[in-house]
Amino acid sequence: MKELGVFDNTIFHVSDEPTIYNADTYQKALQMVEPYLEGAKIIDALSHLDLYEKGIVKNPVPTNDSIHQFLDAGLKNGWVYYCCGQGYKVSNRYIAMPGWRTRILGAQLYKYKMEGFLHWGYNFYNCQYSLHTIDPYRINDGEDAFPAGDPFIVYPGADGKPVESMRLPVMEDAMNDMRLLEYLESLTSREHVLDLIDDYGNLDLRFDEYPSGCDYLQDLWETAAKEVEELIK
């Protein structure tokens, strides 16, 4: 990978959601691969704080319903993720969720300076353990394994190219919200943008607390975009 020039942009992971109960085997697995990954970044999805506090997982990727525990413990510029288990209070992209609940992620990523966002299900068209394939146009939950829409965000096209779901453009909106806020920060200050996010909605935006409905996000976008337009004239 170094010869190809992609090593610095490659991220490795050892185990999905290790816990204190399998910490010994996680550490053994980590020790097996570490000699071959010198200088590489290793991240692992994590829901429980203890392995991070003990220094066993140095670069955790917390779920968005546990992220505030990690932030309170000092996590800086980390990653965050959601998947099939994050269906209460927090953002996700299930088929049954309204678009604003999916889109709020962008403002959250900006406010908490998340370095990355992780999700597993781009085009998983199998049953839970990949014993056989499924037709995602008819079966959208991996045969009762996941919330509908969790395993994929695009559909297979007849020509082998992905077909957008209705949720994919909403995820793009979320990322564009984040990019707009970052750009406005470059023209003003981080404090100004944070005031815009929180004071405009009269709230303290969190991953588990955010305005319901489309108005907040639409107003935030229009206000930020108008300020950018005025500043770059």
Question: What does each model-identified segment do?
Answer:
Residues M1-S130:
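Catalytic-core regions of glycoside hydrolase
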Residues M1-Y26, Q31-S47, S130-K233:
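Catalytic domains of carbohydrate-active enzymes that cleave complex glycans
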